[in-house]
């Protein structure tokens, strides 16, 4: 991010930097807004936050876009659950981690909207609404016509069953506050975005 920011400034280009909810501790009780102070608890989160600061320091015309629970092309949660359902009659999925599933297509649309403007700064961009991983899995299976049972477990229970699993933030809900405050653009509801994604995969 540092070198990109310097290069963008030297040639007068705009810079779009995509960041993450991991810059926050994940212990919130209300949706995080852009004015909330980051407090990353993982190496990944700290790295992303440092990247944001480099952009703010060295770039003149920038859009920092934080998103969460992203899925699209390549490996992602939706495809992982569909794959697991092929070999499992039941799955154990946490229900005490909450966030807003966000389609990469919807994120790209938002960036495409922002990029031609001079509305620079920091933005949160997640699909509207929120859920937990277990309920999200059930919505995926419902759309795919899959009958694999989803057992709801706590993060603590899941960690005991899968000691090597990475720790994730308990609370990942980002409020698209600046987007709503400064533009008339609205992200799609996560259910609708998931419908489109699943249909594109043939479900």
Residue ranges and their predicted role:
Residues 132-138, 156-202:
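Conserved C-terminal active-site "lid" loop/helix of NAD(P)H-dependent oxidoreductases
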Residues 53-99, 105-106, 112:
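NAD(P)-dependent short-chain dehydrogenase/reductase
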Residues 110, 117-164, 190:
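Mid/C-terminal beta-alpha module of Rossmann-like enzyme folds, strongest
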Residues 10-11, 58, 144:
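Helix C-cap/helix->beta junction micro-motif
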Residues 64, 101, 130, 152, ...:
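Short aromatic/basic micro-patch
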Residues 14, 23-65:
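Catalytic helix-loop patch of NAD(P)-dependent Rossmann-fold dehydrogenases
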Residues 1-16:
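NAD(P)-cofactor binding segment of oxidoreductase domains
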Residues 93-98, 123-130, 182:
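Glycine-rich Rossmann NAD(P)(H)-binding loop
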